[in-house]
Amino acid sequence: MWPNSILVLMTLLISSTLVTGGGVKGEEKRVCPPDYVRCIRQDDPQCYSDNDCGDQEICCFWQCGFKCVLPVKDNSEEQIPQSKV
């Protein structure tokens, strides 16, 4: 039962960091930077939400555990111009 509980908890924590709410128009979205580290085990969390971090940082799963990190700009809504064929 213990491993299943940890799996459910981690799934909820990861999914909550992926959900972005609608902000003020013109406000830049704050998203977690890409993390390319493969982990053998997870570190103890240093944060549980953005409220646990400083003004400029957000709580992200980063290098094997939840940590306060500087966000990156979200370019997902910027339209890429199509080439003229």
From Swiss-Prot:
Its main location: secreted. Keywords: Antibiotic, Antimicrobial, Disulfide bond, Protease inhibitor, Secreted, Serine protease inhibitor, Signal. Disulfide bonds join 32-60, 39-64, 47-59, 53-68. It comes from the Eukaryota. GO terms for biological process: defense response to bacterium. GO terms for cellular component: extracellular region. It is found in: Secreted. Pfam families: WAP (PF00095). Constitutively expressed in tongue. Residues 25-72 form the WAP domain. The keyword Signal applies. Antibacterial protein which inhibits the growth of E.coli and S.aureus. Putative acid-stable proteinase inhibitor. This is WAP four-disulfide core domain protein 12. It comes from Mus musculus (Mouse). The gene is Wfdc12.
